[in-house]
Amino acid sequence: MSKSRLTVFSFVRRFLLRLMVVLAVFWGGGIALFSVAPVPFSAVMVERQVSAWLHGNFRYVAHSDWVSMDQISPWMGLAVIAAEDQKFPEHWGFDVASIEKALAHNERNENRIRGASTISQQTAKNLFLWDGRSWVRKGLEAGLTLGIETVWSKKRILTVYLNIAEFGDGVFGVEAAAQRYFHKPASKLTRSEAALLAAVLPNPRRFKVSAPSGYVHSRQAWILRQMYQLGGEPFMQQHQLD
């Protein structure tokens, strides 16, 4: 290898190492800060806003209103656990069994990719990372997930998740969603309304709370059954998530 190539390689290596240190400090500081402080915005919110501006849509506003867990209906927390991650109170950030099932499914159905992200993983991804699928992003997501699982309580993870989850075009967080779709605060959401909001979470840019498709209605009904099977509101109290 020539001297010039060695110099370029050395420069790139130093740059990447420094970048990794900067990102580690930034993300580590974010994890520490948001363990107690309200989250003003997420990486996904920034990405959506910038994308709208780049496409000339200056009317788009990524909107979110932070609320604490005691200002959120217990049905809402239960609904997203029933819909997205029923082992949330028990795991350490990853549901290994679900990951194995998703990998097996994806091998058989390459055109219908199934995910297995837990609420903890989705929180890490939405808060700190860009959208998309890549091994680099998955690796960073895993590290950030371990970080928030180590520093935050399960209640804190659920609180942040509910405040940054995307529920529609420009609608982020359960308070903004409750006000937009039901004209009430998140604390007043009923069991059925919570299940409807949770039903669009797989793809809130495709599935609409304001105009639910047959699939969304069937998923809402399934979530309601799962909420009942989990034990209803006592489930949240039992795991200190309310």
From Swiss-Prot:
InterPro entries: Glyco_trans_51, Lysozyme-like_dom_sf, PBP_transglycosylase, Pep_trsgly. The chain crosses the membrane at residues 19-39. Peptidoglycan polymerase that catalyzes glycan chain elongation from lipid-linked precursors. This is Biosynthetic peptidoglycan transglycosylase. It catalyses: [GlcNAc-(1->4)-Mur2Ac(oyl-L-Ala-gamma-D-Glu-L-Lys-D-Ala-D-Ala)](n)-di-trans,octa-cis-undecaprenyl diphosphate + beta-D-GlcNAc-(1->4)-Mur2Ac(oyl-L-Ala-gamma-D-Glu-L-Lys-D-Ala-D-Ala)-di-trans,octa-cis-undecaprenyl diphosphate = [GlcNAc-(1->4)-Mur2Ac(oyl-L-Ala-gamma-D-Glu-L-Lys-D-Ala-D-Ala)](n+1)-di-trans,octa-cis-undecaprenyl diphosphate + di-trans,octa-cis-undecaprenyl diphosphate + H(+). PANTHER family: BIOSYNTHETIC PEPTIDOGLYCAN TRANSGLYCOSYLASE (PTHR30400:SF0), MONOFUNCTIONAL BIOSYNTHETIC PEPTIDOGLYCAN TRANSGLYCOSYLASE (PTHR30400). One of its GO terms (cellular component) is plasma membrane. One of its GO terms (biological process) is regulation of cell shape. Its EC number is 2.4.99.28. It is found in: Cell inner membrane. It is an enzyme of class 2 (transferase). Pathway: Cell wall biogenesis; peptidoglycan biosynthesis. Belongs to the glycosyltransferase 51 family.
